[in-house]
Amino acid sequence: MSMQYKSIKVQNDMFVSIIKKNKELMMILDYISQLNLPNFYIAAGSVFQTIWNYYDKKPLNYKIKDIDIIYYDANNLSIEDENELENNIINHFSKLGMDYIFDVHNEARMHLWKKNENANINQYKNSEDAIDQWIATVHAIGITKEKDEIKVYAPYGLSDIFSRTIRPIKHKNNTKELYDKKVESWKSRFNNLNIIEW
């Protein structure tokens, strides 16, 4: 039976076991967890694409463009502090020879960032609220660490990741244009994707 048809627990256990094989992602997760960022996740591409690469028998970081790190701190909406945090993370891993693009965002201030792009959204309630509204079900995924255990947040389940099904999340803040752009990016780097049109 394909993994996409297995029980939620079996899928979650397999997902975590594969993620743990990505040693660089684990190094990043360990480091970020030590920063004590509130409500943090490593999220989106670097997470679900690790699974795809595993089944493609590719290096686990193959074609991963960046590492998305999110957290939620409503008590500090400073863009300067967010940028400083991102630069510190970049510098830390650059010294270790891990020259990824790191995108670090405080989801508590995302409504302010979107406003600068002439888009009006409500302030997210927490990091999970942000992930719930991302562009595709495979994209809406995050891993965090609690008491030395990896925890997975997957509001739409893991079946689409295992079956490589790109399914839009038709939230009012999302658009066909943004979805199609993401789909083209994934198609250019990964094969055998099952695309569900907007």
Regions found by a protein language model. Give the residues of each.
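Catalytic cores of the polymerase beta-like nucleotidyltransferase superfamily
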Residues: M1-W198
